[in-house]
Structures are given as C-alpha cells and as structure tokens.
Amino acid sequence: MNEDDIDVNTPSPARIYDYWLGGSHNFAVDREVGKRAAEAMPTLRAAIWANRAFLRRVVTHLATELGVDQFLDLGSGVPTVGNVHEVAQAANPAARVVYVDIDPIAVAHGRRLLADDDRATVIQADLRRPADVLSRPELGEVLDLGRPVAVLMIAVLHFLPDADHPGDIVRAYRDRIAPGSYLALSHAADDTDLPAEQARMIEEYQKSTKVPFIHRDPDELAGWLDGLELVPPGIVLTNQWHPDEEASRILRTHGVVARKP
C-alpha cells in the first residue's frame, strides 16, 4: 500500500464503520464524523452490531443450509469481529472467501489478517466495476467462478447514488456468476417512516462526508434481483430474516438473499 493512496483528510465509510465498532483503523476525521453521528443517534452502535449479526446469519445459512463454500464480500470494510471467513470456515473449514474494498486501509489490514490463510484474500478494487473485480487474478486464485458462489453486498449499496446505477451493478454480478450462485444484500429502507433519531444521524453523516446515503424501497430492490429466486422469507427488514436472537429494530434496513437458477 502506497501512503500517497491514503487520504487522511476525507472521511471514509469503511473507517467510520470501524470507529463505530470500536476499532482502531481510523483517523481523526473519521472519528469526528462518527462521533457526531453517534451523538445524533445514541443507539447507533447497537444498530451497527445488529447489521453484523445479519451478516453472520446470512453466511451461516448459506454455508450450513444451502451448501455454499465460496463467498465474495463486496465493500467488506476494515476487518473486525465476525469476519465472513471466520463465520464461513466455522461452518465449513473448506470455505473460501475473497474480500473487496476500495479503501487502502481496509485492504492493508485485511491482508495482514489473512496472511496465513490460503483460503481467503482481500483485493483493492471498485465494486462498481464488476468485470474488473471478477477478472482479477488474485480472485481466481481463491474462488472458482465456474462453481456457485455467494456474492455479499451488505450495507454498501445505499452509499451508491442513482447516477452509479446500482441496479445495473447488481445485475452485472448476477450475469457473471454460475448457476446455483447467490446474491445477498442489505440496504437502508425507504425514509417514509424513518425513526427520528436515525433521520438525524443520516443528516449529520451526509453533512460531514462526500459519500451519499440513499434510501430505497423494497420494490426497487426487487427490480435489481429480476431473474433470481428469492430465498424465503424474501425481502424483509433484516431483524426478520431468519432471526436467531432478539434482533434490533433500531436501524431500518431491508435484507434479502436470492439464488441464480
């Protein structure tokens, strides 16, 4: 990683998220934004951990119930507790995982974490360029795209404005993965009935960063998944997706897993 690649003056979603989770891989500018957002929404950290719980449930279900042993985690962020490879390999020691993030700090720490694991790696790439991501030699060294793979887009697509055409991005990954593969995503729910404190948090976040935060409704998400079979219970609030504990209702996000026939 080249130090010139690291912008310490611009907040990064990956590093802000790391700060909220209590991590140390962040800078003063990230902590300042994260602190103001958390002050606007005191329950924010609990909601962030609830999102991690959703990711864990998805990976566990895919590995144990649906037989998936390959995972591609897009916008994976800074490594923290409950990483995909830890959850997947606990269910199936042969599971293989590739992480993708654009943030050089996230990638550097991911590579350090995975240095001794030949079944997992991290790639610095832009998830908005599916053809580039899927053609990377490093990815091909870990994943066999001729076999089913689970593509994870957890809490990342709401950072993409409509100008980035997130639906087209999702469909591009769909078209390039093998039959029997899965797409899993979570996304901030539409803001028509948003809790007041979450609305304040998002307003504070958007004032402080250059990164958008877009709410979208379930019908739009469903359109992104055309041609796929939704795994029951379909598109629901994440706390309702195969809950195995008291799931948080604080942060309104929808989640879904879909299979490519």
Specify the residue positions occupied by each region the protein language model found.
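Short alpha-helix
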Residues: 211-235
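Core SAM-dependent methyltransferase catalytic element
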Residues: 234-236, 240-261
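Rossmann-like AdoMet
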Residues: 1-125, 129-131, 135-143
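Residues lining the SAM
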Residues: 125, 148-157
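Conserved beta-strand signature within the Rossmann-like core of class I S-adenosyl-L-methionine
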Residues: 149-153, 169-170, 176-188
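Conserved Class I S-adenosyl-L-methionine
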Residues: 197-217
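A short, conserved alpha-helix within the catalytic core of class I
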Residues: 130-134, 159-172
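Short "lid" loop at the C-terminus of a central beta-strand within the Rossmann-like core
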Residues: 128, 157-159, 188-193
